[in-house]
Amino acid sequence: AVPGVRRYARSKGVDLTCITGSGNHGKITREDIDAYLANAAPTPTQPTAPAPTSEENTTPAAESTPQPATSSSGQRREKMSAIRKAAARALTEVVTTVPVVTILDRVEVSALVAHRNRLKDTAATREAKLTYTPYIVKACVAMLKKNPLMNGRVDMAAGEFIYYDTFNIGVATNTDRGLFVPIIKDADRKSLFDIAREITELSSHAKAGTLTSADMSGGSMTVTNVGGFATSGVWSTPIINAPEAAILGIGRFEDEFLPDKKGKPVLRPVCKLSFAFDHRLIDGVDAQKALNDLKEFLHNPDLLLAES
């Protein structure tokens, strides 16, 4: 690891000998350290069962619920799990060091809904669960291809912008153990059904606690769905998954009256979008242009599949 990475590891209390590097010639990167912390085993002082932190693909014992310390003052204390501690550190670092700007927008998606409805039964025969997320992953790839300045990160220590030639899209996955972001690697080379199958597989690993550091490192940007729950959201202000430079929040689909070609109001499904980006790398006008491209791809899935 380079000196800056070693200093970063020391500041996080991480032993570099426990990490397998994903950089050139096996070098350890900041992303490797962040991924290791996100999937770290609980410390011995915590009342939790051990989980693997190496590249082993074994199923860990279930993490037990921390026992609260009772108090007569109307308060209670609970130990944070190692995962929660790592997430808290990472999120705090982002909000205190990265100037994040969020753009809120919407897109009409009737063609996308119809396209998925036509394909979902066929997808099932090919062992693919076709939700809207694979479309959104491909739309992010197509957007990054048209806007290559979006596909990068900031290295403040070196005073450099680093741009990627790969298109790796993270998909935020909620589990009982916390939030994980497995990465769809080389998403530009995969079909809609391939991405659907991989999302299902990575989600299963996240819920089982068997994701590796390699599964969660090297992302170009992240997609997070706040509209897929019983109490689904509309817009949000998502925090970027550093060192990535952008994250796309997907809200619920809602029917709204929109004018047709003759100006007559017609009920159409509309998806809410929350696009957050690192303003050090991306200017506002470029971010809006990229978001407009993404909206076009979601509005026209035939164009999306032709471009990506």
Locate predicted features.
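ABC ATPase nucleotide-binding domain signature region
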Residues: 1
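C-terminal catalytic/motor cores of large multi-domain enzyme assemblies
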Residues: 4, 8, 12-15, 27, ...
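Catalytic-site-adjacent helices and loops of nucleotide signaling machinery
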Residues: 21-22
